[in-house]
């Protein structure tokens, strides 16, 4: 049960930037975890420690975080001898060792790497599949397969096109299983490529950070129109619905929203007030089968969020607003800012805190969507996490790029392992029937 050794190293994420990988050894074997990284990061996220004083890797190295694992966290944990099955005790020990609320001393990327590896080791110690172990940690007796939200058109900070809104997603809510959902997602994705190629040419089929296409369009409505057409051609109208991640903090300027923010000469007269921006979203919801909108407003535009949430029945997801942080989530619940939490383990920096954030949101009647980051690795931990936490929904990119498929393929394996007992969230993705 005891940890024998911990070793961290610097590896690379899917954008070619350095990130932290941790190896943890017990008598059961070696357990490896890699930490993801975001592009559009909320200002309230736990601190991802980068080597800003070094010119190497454009000041994005993580050797300081690696050193903190190898020279501070590892010796302290080895001395403490906490069993790997005591996840909360291990995480709390590292949080106290850091001493800062945002994990700014050791780095959230250092602490999370160890936390992930400990979780994998704990599952092995109890001879449980990782998803079953996570369910045990969260107090769930059963598990559920999630609806995948495939990000098939990329804009915002994830792509070099003119689109302001960051992600246009498809959700196969009408599938009968996760396996069928993958088929639907793949077929819509390839039909979308054909639609984009026909209308904009082959170079418009370049993909963004998360595997989605990045056609050089500026009209966000056009992105939705392309999705609707691809869904229709694939034969899944009514079975595949649409989601969006607006990442509106990226185009928030001087209290207004600039949908031409990538243009240095953007005309201020065209910027939209929060109410005008809300009307754009309402028009989209009316015209297209949208079931989920993430980050429709700036992370601190607290007045705008509750108005939109109260005016629509769809899922309004807080990401930059809540950053998987219990204090931010508590405030959002109090003012009824949104009705769904986007759960990113690296925003808060430990498994225990991620589970606590999830349970807090679910207790308030919110949905929870587990998420990857745009800078990913081949680590597929979040696939087991979403099944174990029973959230019913996951977004981890398009059905393209191996670091994205690593998660989807693991979910296929889990569904196969569950066999006839596997349950797919489907139309109940916001509140899965466990």
Swiss-Prot record:
For this UniProt record, give its keywords in alphabetical order, as a comma-separated list. Answer: Cytoplasm, Glycolysis, Lyase, Magnesium, Metal-binding
Q: What is its main location?
A: cytoplasm
Cofactor(s) recorded for this entry are: Mg(2+)
Please give the pathway this protein is involved in. Answer: Carbohydrate degradation; glycolysis; pyruvate from D-glyceraldehyde 3-phosphate: step 4/5
- Location(s) in or outside the cell: Cytoplasm
Identify the PROSITE patterns for this entry. Answer: ENOLASE
Q: In Gene Ontology terms, what is a biological process of this protein?
A: glycolytic process
Tell me the residue numbers annotated for binding substrate. 158, 167, 294, 319, 371-374, 395
User: What CDD domains does UniProt report for this protein, alphabetically?
Assistant: enolase
InterPro entries associated with the record: Enolase, Enolase-like_C_sf, Enolase-like_N, Enolase_C, Enolase_CS, Enolase_N
Q: What is its EC number?
A: 4.2.1.11
> GO CC: one term?
phosphopyruvate hydratase complex
Entry annotation: catalytic residues: 210, 344
What's a Pfam family in this record? Answer: Enolase_C
Instruction: Summarize where Mg(2+) binds, as residue positions.
Output: 245, 294, 319
UniProt keyword Cell membrane, yes or no: no
Q: Does the keyword Cytoplasm apply?
A: yes
The record's family statement is: Belongs to the enolase family.
NCBIfam families, per the entry: eno (TIGR01060)
Assembly and interaction partners: Homodimer.
- HAMAP family recorded for this chain? Enolase
Q: What is this protein called?
A: Enolase
Tell me the organism. Schistosoma japonicum (Blood fluke)
